[in-house]
Each structure stands twice: as C-alpha cells, then as structure tokens.
Amino acid sequence: MSEFIKPYNDDPFVGNLSTPVSTSSFSKGTSRNLPAYRRGLSPLLRGLEIGMAHGYFLIGPFDKLGPLRGTDVALLAGFLSSVGLIIILTTCLSMYGNVSFTRADSKDPLQTSEGWGQFTAGFLVGAVGGSGFAYLLLANIPVLQTAGLSLFS
C-alpha cells in the first residue's frame, strides 16, 4: 500500500497525500468542472450556479424530515424554511465578504469586496430560484412527492 500512497510531489512537508483517487485524471477533471474551481466564470454566475444547487437540495430535508411532515402543508413549510435558511446563509456570506476582502487590487475578481458581493447576490437569486423550482416540481408531479416516502417510514 505504501507504493500507492505517498507525499504529494514527493515533499513530506506539504501535508497532503497523493492517493490513486486524489491524483486520478477523473477526480481532477470532475473537481475542475465544479463552479467553485471553473476558470473564466464571473462571480455572479458562480454564485448563481452554486445557489441553484443548494436551493434545490435544501427543500427536501425540510419537507420530509421537518416537524410538519405528513401534513398537507409540509411542502409549503419546507419551501419557506429553505428560503429562510437561504436568507441566513446569504447574510453570513455577505458578512464574511465585508470582513475578509478589503483590498481591491486582487487578480481574482472573487477575492475582492465587489466580486464577493456579486457572488452573494448570485447565490441568493440562484438558491431561491432552485428552491422554488424544486417546490414547483414536487407540488405538480405527484410521483416525485411519494418517491422517497419508503425511505423515511
């Protein structure tokens, strides 16, 4: 096993291990295509794409595992709860950006206060839109509403 796992770039002081999974071309290609690492993406579009994914998957746990599960208003309560959490997350992202990025001369636009503000705005719009899209899918397609019930009952 020691021939497979070795220090990254043969430098034991880096603190990162080079494994067959972490150094494979598939893993590197997959992580390069994530919006956080994709080159040439503006902060607004980066936030929009990350927000859509988060908003889309946040509604499920609130709907199926929330205190109103099994009631007629569970889906609406799940949607409103996910929007509430999205607003809290957006507030936290905004506070982080105001405190962390004070320089305006960074080469990466996401590392500036203005770029982080665009990212946060994109995140808010994308997350509320993703959560709304998931709500509309679950409200109008009954098969999706009952698909996961066997997992939680």
From Swiss-Prot:
Its main location: plastid. The chain crosses the membrane at residues 73-93, 119-139. It is a multi-pass membrane protein. Signal peptide: none annotated. GO terms for biological process: photosynthesis. The keyword Nucleotide-binding does not apply. It holds the Pfam family PsaL. It is found in: Plastid, Chloroplast thylakoid membrane. The keyword Thylakoid applies. Keywords: Chloroplast, Membrane, Photosynthesis, Photosystem I, Plastid, Thylakoid, Transmembrane, Transmembrane helix. It comes from the Eukaryota. GO terms for cellular component: chloroplast thylakoid membrane; photosystem I reaction center. Belongs to the PsaL family. This is Photosystem I reaction center subunit XI. The gene is psaL.
